[in-house]
Amino acid sequence: MSGGSADYSRDHGGPEGMEPDGVIESNWNEIVDNFDDMNLKESLLRGIYAYGFEKPSAIQQRAIIPCIKGYDVIAQAQSGTGKTATFAISILQQLEIDLKETQALVLAPTRELAQQIQKVILALGDYMGATCHACIGGTNVRNEMQKLQAEAPHIVVGTPGRVFDMLNRRYLSPKWIKMFVLDEADEMLSRGFKDQIYEIFQKLSTNIQVVLLSATMPMDVLEVTKKFMREPIRILVKKEELTLEGIKQFYINVEREEWKLDTLCDLYETLTITQAVIFLNTRRKVDWLTEKMHARDFTVSALHGDMDQKERDVIMREFRSGSSRVLITTDLLARGIDVQQVSLVINYDLPTNRENYIHRIGRGGRFGRKGVAINFVTEEDKRILRDIETFYNTTVEEMPMNVADLI
């Protein structure tokens, strides 16, 4: 495949279309700010609105159209911008629903993200009758083979190792796959999946449409775009376009760290009006807080990276279904949680780096869905909060007494 427009330029040693600091320049200016104007199938539109989307996010306004038109697309966007739905909608629009063959393949760096993408695709494609299978490690290979052989799902989403394995053993046929999506490409490459990704490309048709999404654009990501993409459309969603819109942000002054627990317990009634996610900075603290809350007879569930896959799945299932209402977790899993009903996020600890702030609270009010974020702030935290306000050009106000009315 020709590398398209990414030839190296002399000025700053980076590929053309790149600024020196690893940010791509957009070469596509068309913006469609309404799902109704995208010429989507009626059944897909129903799925989009039923899912709770009202208007497209910045990346959706820009990237859905070129994806649907069949262009190769590179989109630089953080998580929390609505990128999953961007490629989910693009895939679903291009599906031939009566063709019972796999027509799109999506790669993601982690099992959680792959399962999350699968859920979004199934929800958006619900009225179309689209089928989607998650092909991930940590599950039974034999079951997977039987599943893929029994009926080919329209869409396969998975982690590179397992997807390559299924292609290699010919349980997953590349014959009808016309769209290949790499989500969080920077993450996949930094986790050492480069060889598998290259091998997967070798097994796919040479004129396949490639859509690559990445928060950052390091050399190894650019190498993939240069090698496997043809004259790609480049779309950059800048930080300030990440949405804090519609999210009311508050802080509560908590004089001392040890008083946070009582503050949280006082808020508990408010939390359970809907569903809430509480973020802490360490796994140990997640366990500690969960125990303390249980000891006081509050119902909460906890999720962190030390738990095994089965346990994590059960907890997420309970939370998604609404049978558990308060989830305590760490940043590690912030990216894997996108639950419709979450309209309240509590930062028990402020995030250690400011980028994570949007990953956490971007959950609460995505895409026109409103949300409330409450930050617990000690004396030492005030500087961090000011830093966050400056970084996102936003204001965090003291929490009013009637916060329950806002949720």
Curated annotation (Swiss-Prot):
Cited InterPro entries: DEAD/DEAH_box_helicase_dom, EIF4A_DEADc, Helicase_ATP-bd, Helicase_C-like, P-loop_NTPase, RNA-helicase_DEAD-box_CS, RNA_helicase_DEAD_Q_motif
Keyword Protein biosynthesis: yes
Renumbered ranges of motif DEAD box: 183-186
Substrates-to-products reaction catalysed: ATP + H2O = ADP + phosphate + H(+)
Motif interval(s): Q motif: 33-61
A GO term, aspect molecular function: ATP binding
Pfam assignment, any one: DEAD
Keyword Cell cycle: no
EC number: 3.6.4.13
Role, per record: ATP-dependent RNA helicase which is a subunit of the eIF4F complex involved in cap recognition and is required for mRNA binding to ribosome. In the current model of translation initiation, eIF4A unwinds RNA secondary structures in the 5'-UTR of mRNAs which is necessary to allow efficient binding of the small ribosomal subunit, and subsequent scanning for the initiator codon.
Protein known as: Eukaryotic initiation factor 4A-II
